[in-house]
From Swiss-Prot:
Membrane-spanning ranges: 34-54, 63-83, 98-118, 147-167, 173-193, 216-236, 258-278
GO cellular component assignments: membrane
Family designation: Belongs to the G-protein coupled receptor 1 family. Mas subfamily.
UniProt topological domain (Extracellular) ranges: 1-33, 84-97, 168-172, 237-257
Residue ranges, annotated region (Disordered): 299-321
Name of protein: Mas-related G-protein coupled receptor member B4
Keyword annotations from UniProtKB, A to Z: G-protein coupled receptor, Glycoprotein, Membrane, Receptor, Transducer, Transmembrane, Transmembrane helix
InterPro entries: GPCR_Rhodpsn, GPCR_Rhodpsn_7TM, MRGPCRFAMILY
Native source species: Mus musculus (Mouse)
Function: Orphan receptor. Probably involved in the function of nociceptive neurons. May regulate nociceptor function and/or development, including the sensation or modulation of pain.
Bilayer topology annotation: Multi-pass membrane protein
Predominant cellular place of this UniProt entry's protein: membrane
Record topology, Cytoplasmic segments: 55-62, 119-146, 194-215, 279-321
Glycosylation sites: 11, 16, 94
Amino acid sequence: MGTTTLAWNINNTAENGSYTEMFSCITKFNTLNFLTVIIAVVGLAGNGIVLWLLAFHLHRNAFSVYVLNLAGADFLYLFTQVVHSLECVLQLDNNSFYILLIVTMFAYLAGLCMIAAISAERCLSVMWPIWYHCQRPRHTSAIMCALVWVSSLLLSLVVGLGCGFLFSYYDYYFCITLNFITAAFLIVLSVVLSVSSLALLVKIVWGSHRIPVTRFFVTIALTVVVFIYFGMPFGICWFLLSRIMEFDSIFFNNVYEIIEFLSCVNSCANPIIYFLVGSIRQHRLRWQSLKLLLQRAMQDTPEEESGERGPSQRSGELETV
Protein backbone atom coordinates (compact mmCIF):
# COMPACT_ATOMS: atom_id res chain seq x y z
CA MET A 1 0.00 0.00 0.00
CA GLY A 2 2.80 2.41 0.92
CA THR A 3 4.68 1.60 -2.30
CA THR A 4 1.55 2.21 -4.39
CA THR A 5 0.88 5.55 -2.67
CA LEU A 6 4.51 6.64 -3.15
CA ALA A 7 4.40 5.75 -6.85
CA TRP A 8 1.11 7.65 -7.27
CA ASN A 9 2.58 10.70 -5.53
CA ILE A 10 5.66 10.60 -7.76
CA ASN A 11 3.55 10.32 -10.93
CA ASN A 12 1.22 13.08 -9.73
CA THR A 13 4.17 15.37 -8.97
CA ALA A 14 5.69 14.67 -12.41
CA GLU A 15 2.37 15.39 -14.13
CA ASN A 16 1.92 18.62 -12.16
CA GLY A 17 5.45 19.70 -13.00
CA SER A 18 4.89 18.91 -16.67
CA TYR A 19 1.59 20.81 -16.65
CA THR A 20 3.17 23.82 -14.93
CA GLU A 21 6.01 23.88 -17.43
CA MET A 22 3.58 23.59 -20.35
CA PHE A 23 1.37 26.37 -18.94
CA SER A 24 4.44 28.58 -18.51
CA CYS A 25 5.48 27.96 -22.14
CA ILE A 26 1.98 28.76 -23.41
CA THR A 27 1.88 31.97 -21.36
CA LYS A 28 5.26 33.10 -22.72
CA PHE A 29 4.19 32.17 -26.24
CA ASN A 30 0.95 34.17 -26.05
CA THR A 31 2.66 37.13 -24.37
CA LEU A 32 5.31 37.29 -27.09
CA ASN A 33 2.68 37.06 -29.82
CA PHE A 34 0.63 39.80 -28.14
CA LEU A 35 3.71 42.06 -27.99
CA THR A 36 4.41 41.24 -31.63
CA VAL A 37 0.91 42.39 -32.57
CA ILE A 38 1.38 45.69 -30.69
CA ILE A 39 4.78 46.39 -32.28
CA ALA A 40 3.53 45.38 -35.72
CA VAL A 41 0.45 47.64 -35.51
CA VAL A 42 2.66 50.60 -34.54
CA GLY A 43 4.97 49.74 -37.43
CA LEU A 44 2.04 49.49 -39.85
CA ALA A 45 0.96 53.00 -38.87
CA GLY A 46 4.50 54.39 -39.21
CA ASN A 47 5.23 52.75 -42.55
CA GLY A 48 1.78 53.71 -43.80
CA ILE A 49 2.55 57.37 -43.06
CA VAL A 50 5.92 57.09 -44.86
CA LEU A 51 4.23 55.48 -47.87
CA TRP A 52 1.55 58.16 -47.98
CA LEU A 53 4.01 61.06 -47.69
CA LEU A 54 6.59 59.76 -50.18
CA ALA A 55 3.97 58.63 -52.69
CA PHE A 56 1.76 61.73 -52.72
CA HIS A 57 3.32 64.66 -50.85
CA LEU A 58 7.08 64.73 -51.45
CA HIS A 59 9.24 64.97 -54.55
CA ARG A 60 11.28 61.81 -54.91
CA ASN A 61 15.00 61.45 -55.58
CA ALA A 62 17.10 58.38 -56.34
CA PHE A 63 17.26 57.29 -52.71
CA SER A 64 13.74 58.14 -51.55
CA VAL A 65 12.41 55.75 -54.23
CA TYR A 66 14.19 52.93 -52.38
CA VAL A 67 12.89 54.21 -49.04
CA LEU A 68 9.35 54.22 -50.46
CA ASN A 69 9.67 50.61 -51.59
CA LEU A 70 11.35 49.61 -48.32
CA ALA A 71 8.36 51.04 -46.44
CA GLY A 72 6.10 48.97 -48.70
CA ALA A 73 8.06 45.79 -47.95
CA ASP A 74 8.03 46.51 -44.21
CA PHE A 75 4.29 47.23 -44.31
CA LEU A 76 3.59 43.91 -46.04
CA TYR A 77 5.86 42.01 -43.66
CA LEU A 78 4.26 43.54 -40.56
CA PHE A 79 0.78 42.79 -41.90
CA THR A 80 1.60 39.08 -42.22
CA GLN A 81 2.99 39.07 -38.67
CA VAL A 82 -0.17 40.66 -37.28
CA VAL A 83 -2.34 38.03 -38.98
CA HIS A 84 -0.09 35.14 -37.91
CA SER A 85 0.25 36.32 -34.29
CA LEU A 86 -3.50 36.89 -33.93
CA GLU A 87 -4.17 33.40 -35.28
CA CYS A 88 -1.78 32.00 -32.65
CA VAL A 89 -3.16 34.03 -29.72
CA LEU A 90 -6.83 33.51 -30.60
CA GLN A 91 -6.21 29.90 -31.69
CA LEU A 92 -7.94 30.46 -35.01
CA ASP A 93 -7.93 28.08 -37.93
CA ASN A 94 -4.55 28.54 -39.61
CA ASN A 95 -5.36 27.23 -43.09
CA SER A 96 -3.59 30.29 -44.46
CA PHE A 97 -0.34 29.48 -42.62
CA TYR A 98 1.65 28.45 -45.68
CA ILE A 99 0.35 31.37 -47.74
CA LEU A 100 1.48 33.73 -44.98
CA LEU A 101 4.82 31.94 -44.95
CA ILE A 102 5.37 32.67 -48.64
CA VAL A 103 4.26 36.30 -48.32
CA THR A 104 6.51 36.76 -45.27
CA MET A 105 9.49 35.38 -47.17
CA PHE A 106 8.66 37.61 -50.16
CA ALA A 107 8.42 40.77 -48.04
CA TYR A 108 11.58 39.97 -46.05
CA LEU A 109 13.69 39.35 -49.17
CA ALA A 110 12.37 42.51 -50.81
CA GLY A 111 13.18 44.57 -47.71
CA LEU A 112 16.71 43.20 -47.48
CA CYS A 113 17.29 43.90 -51.18
CA MET A 114 16.07 47.49 -50.77
CA ILE A 115 18.42 48.16 -47.84
CA ALA A 116 21.36 46.62 -49.72
CA ALA A 117 20.52 48.70 -52.82
CA ILE A 118 20.31 51.94 -50.80
CA SER A 119 23.66 51.26 -49.12
CA ALA A 120 25.39 50.22 -52.37
CA GLU A 121 24.10 53.17 -54.39
CA ARG A 122 25.01 55.66 -51.67
CA CYS A 123 28.50 54.15 -51.55
CA LEU A 124 28.85 54.56 -55.34
CA SER A 125 27.70 58.18 -55.17
CA VAL A 126 30.41 58.96 -52.58
CA MET A 127 33.26 56.87 -54.03
CA TRP A 128 32.81 57.90 -57.67
CA PRO A 129 30.66 61.06 -57.61
CA ILE A 130 31.46 62.25 -61.16
CA TRP A 131 30.69 58.89 -62.74
CA TYR A 132 27.57 58.50 -60.61
CA HIS A 133 26.06 61.88 -61.48
CA CYS A 134 27.04 61.80 -65.17
CA GLN A 135 26.68 58.15 -66.19
CA ARG A 136 23.90 56.83 -63.95
CA PRO A 137 20.72 56.18 -65.98
CA ARG A 138 17.85 58.40 -64.92
CA HIS A 139 15.38 55.69 -63.86
CA THR A 140 17.85 53.29 -62.23
CA SER A 141 16.09 53.34 -58.85
CA ALA A 142 12.66 52.54 -60.28
CA ILE A 143 14.06 49.74 -62.47
CA MET A 144 16.04 48.25 -59.58
CA CYS A 145 13.00 48.29 -57.30
CA ALA A 146 10.88 46.56 -59.96
CA LEU A 147 13.57 43.88 -60.38
CA VAL A 148 13.75 43.42 -56.61
CA TRP A 149 10.00 42.87 -56.29
CA VAL A 150 9.87 40.46 -59.23
CA SER A 151 12.93 38.41 -58.21
CA SER A 152 11.82 38.20 -54.56
CA LEU A 153 8.34 37.07 -55.60
CA LEU A 154 9.67 34.45 -58.03
CA LEU A 155 12.15 33.05 -55.50
CA SER A 156 9.45 32.86 -52.82
CA LEU A 157 7.02 31.10 -55.16
CA VAL A 158 9.65 28.60 -56.31
CA VAL A 159 10.54 27.77 -52.70
CA GLY A 160 6.83 27.49 -51.87
CA LEU A 161 6.22 25.11 -54.76
CA GLY A 162 9.35 23.01 -54.23
CA CYS A 163 8.94 22.67 -50.46
CA GLY A 164 5.22 21.84 -50.54
CA PHE A 165 3.95 25.11 -49.05
CA LEU A 166 1.51 25.83 -51.89
CA PHE A 167 0.62 22.37 -53.22
CA SER A 168 1.00 18.80 -52.05
CA TYR A 169 4.09 18.26 -54.20
CA TYR A 170 7.23 17.97 -52.06
CA ASP A 171 10.74 16.98 -53.06
CA TYR A 172 13.11 16.85 -50.09
CA TYR A 173 16.36 17.26 -52.03
CA PHE A 174 14.92 19.94 -54.31
CA CYS A 175 13.68 21.83 -51.24
CA ILE A 176 17.10 21.61 -49.59
CA THR A 177 18.72 22.85 -52.81
CA LEU A 178 16.33 25.80 -52.91
CA ASN A 179 17.12 26.58 -49.28
CA PHE A 180 20.84 26.64 -50.07
CA ILE A 181 20.25 28.88 -53.10
CA THR A 182 18.17 31.28 -51.02
CA ALA A 183 20.74 31.21 -48.23
CA ALA A 184 23.47 32.04 -50.76
CA PHE A 185 21.31 34.91 -52.05
CA LEU A 186 20.97 36.21 -48.49
CA ILE A 187 24.71 35.92 -47.90
CA VAL A 188 25.48 37.89 -51.08
CA LEU A 189 23.04 40.64 -50.09
CA SER A 190 24.46 40.74 -46.56
CA VAL A 191 28.02 41.05 -47.91
CA VAL A 192 26.98 43.87 -50.27
CA LEU A 193 25.22 45.62 -47.40
CA SER A 194 28.14 45.24 -44.98
CA VAL A 195 30.96 46.08 -47.42
CA SER A 196 29.24 49.14 -48.90
CA SER A 197 28.32 50.47 -45.46
CA LEU A 198 31.85 49.92 -44.15
CA ALA A 199 33.42 51.51 -47.24
CA LEU A 200 31.12 54.50 -46.90
CA LEU A 201 32.02 54.88 -43.23
CA VAL A 202 35.77 54.66 -43.92
CA LYS A 203 35.51 57.18 -46.76
CA ILE A 204 33.63 59.69 -44.61
CA VAL A 205 35.68 59.31 -41.41
CA TRP A 206 39.20 58.58 -42.68
CA GLY A 207 39.11 59.72 -46.32
CA SER A 208 41.74 62.17 -47.62
CA HIS A 209 38.98 64.57 -48.65
CA ARG A 210 36.66 64.89 -45.71
CA ILE A 211 33.02 64.41 -46.68
CA PRO A 212 30.46 66.14 -44.45
CA VAL A 213 27.95 63.89 -42.71
CA THR A 214 24.43 64.51 -43.98
CA ARG A 215 21.10 63.60 -42.44
CA PHE A 216 20.58 60.95 -45.09
CA PHE A 217 23.89 59.28 -44.21
CA VAL A 218 22.75 59.10 -40.57
CA THR A 219 19.42 57.66 -41.74
CA ILE A 220 21.16 54.95 -43.78
CA ALA A 221 23.65 54.12 -41.01
CA LEU A 222 20.94 53.70 -38.36
CA THR A 223 18.75 51.66 -40.71
CA VAL A 224 21.63 49.29 -41.50
CA VAL A 225 22.65 48.88 -37.84
CA VAL A 226 19.07 48.18 -36.75
CA PHE A 227 18.63 45.64 -39.55
CA ILE A 228 21.85 43.79 -38.69
CA TYR A 229 20.87 43.43 -35.03
CA PHE A 230 17.11 42.91 -35.35
CA GLY A 231 16.34 41.87 -38.93
CA MET A 232 19.25 39.66 -39.94
CA PRO A 233 18.59 36.91 -37.32
CA PHE A 234 15.22 36.22 -38.97
CA GLY A 235 16.89 35.37 -42.28
CA ILE A 236 19.49 33.19 -40.57
CA CYS A 237 16.82 31.32 -38.60
CA TRP A 238 14.46 31.01 -41.55
CA PHE A 239 16.86 29.18 -43.83
CA LEU A 240 18.09 26.89 -41.06
CA LEU A 241 14.46 25.87 -40.44
CA SER A 242 14.64 22.40 -41.97
CA ARG A 243 17.90 21.59 -40.15
CA ILE A 244 16.76 22.88 -36.75
CA MET A 245 13.39 21.12 -36.85
CA GLU A 246 15.12 17.80 -37.38
CA PHE A 247 16.94 18.18 -34.06
CA ASP A 248 14.58 20.01 -31.72
CA SER A 249 11.25 21.44 -32.87
CA ILE A 250 10.49 22.87 -29.40
CA PHE A 251 13.77 24.76 -29.38
CA PHE A 252 13.08 26.05 -32.88
CA ASN A 253 9.57 27.27 -32.00
CA ASN A 254 10.83 29.19 -28.96
CA VAL A 255 13.72 30.77 -30.83
CA TYR A 256 11.59 31.50 -33.90
CA GLU A 257 8.98 33.43 -31.90
CA ILE A 258 11.68 35.62 -30.33
CA ILE A 259 13.37 36.27 -33.68
CA GLU A 260 10.00 37.00 -35.28
CA PHE A 261 9.39 39.63 -32.61
CA LEU A 262 12.83 41.18 -33.21
CA SER A 263 12.20 41.36 -36.96
CA CYS A 264 8.95 43.25 -36.27
CA VAL A 265 10.96 45.68 -34.15
CA ASN A 266 13.28 46.17 -37.14
CA SER A 267 10.44 46.97 -39.55
CA CYS A 268 8.77 49.20 -36.96
CA ALA A 269 12.00 51.10 -36.25
CA ASN A 270 12.58 52.44 -39.77
CA PRO A 271 9.86 55.15 -39.75
CA ILE A 272 10.90 56.14 -36.23
CA ILE A 273 14.49 56.55 -37.47
CA TYR A 274 13.34 58.79 -40.33
CA PHE A 275 11.35 61.12 -38.08
CA LEU A 276 14.01 61.21 -35.35
CA VAL A 277 16.79 62.05 -37.82
CA GLY A 278 14.55 64.71 -39.34
CA SER A 279 14.13 66.35 -35.94
CA ILE A 280 17.88 66.55 -35.14
CA ARG A 281 19.25 70.05 -34.44
CA GLN A 282 15.89 71.73 -34.37
CA HIS A 283 16.43 74.58 -31.91
CA ARG A 284 12.94 76.01 -32.13
CA LEU A 285 10.65 74.12 -29.79
CA ARG A 286 7.58 73.87 -31.99
CA TRP A 287 5.62 71.07 -33.58
CA GLN A 288 7.15 69.95 -36.85
CA SER A 289 4.94 68.31 -39.47
CA LEU A 290 5.78 64.69 -40.29
CA LYS A 291 6.16 65.71 -43.93
CA LEU A 292 8.89 68.20 -43.04
CA LEU A 293 10.67 65.74 -40.75
CA LEU A 294 10.69 63.04 -43.43
CA GLN A 295 11.96 65.52 -46.02
CA ARG A 296 14.83 66.48 -43.71
CA ALA A 297 15.70 62.82 -43.11
CA MET A 298 16.06 62.37 -46.89
CA GLN A 299 18.27 65.50 -47.08
CA ASP A 300 21.63 64.64 -48.67
CA THR A 301 23.31 68.05 -48.37
CA PRO A 302 25.41 69.39 -45.48
CA GLU A 303 23.50 71.28 -42.79
CA GLU A 304 25.27 74.59 -43.42
CA GLU A 305 24.85 74.39 -47.18
CA SER A 306 21.18 73.44 -47.00
CA GLY A 307 20.52 76.25 -44.56
CA GLU A 308 21.71 78.83 -47.09
CA ARG A 309 19.48 77.57 -49.86
CA GLY A 310 15.92 78.53 -50.44
CA PRO A 311 13.01 76.10 -50.31
CA SER A 312 12.70 76.02 -54.09
CA GLN A 313 16.33 74.97 -54.50
CA ARG A 314 16.05 72.22 -51.90
CA SER A 315 12.91 70.79 -53.45
CA GLY A 316 14.61 70.85 -56.83
CA GLU A 317 17.25 68.46 -55.50
CA LEU A 318 14.57 65.93 -54.72
CA GLU A 319 13.09 65.68 -58.19
CA THR A 320 15.70 63.46 -59.84
CA VAL A 321 14.80 59.77 -59.67
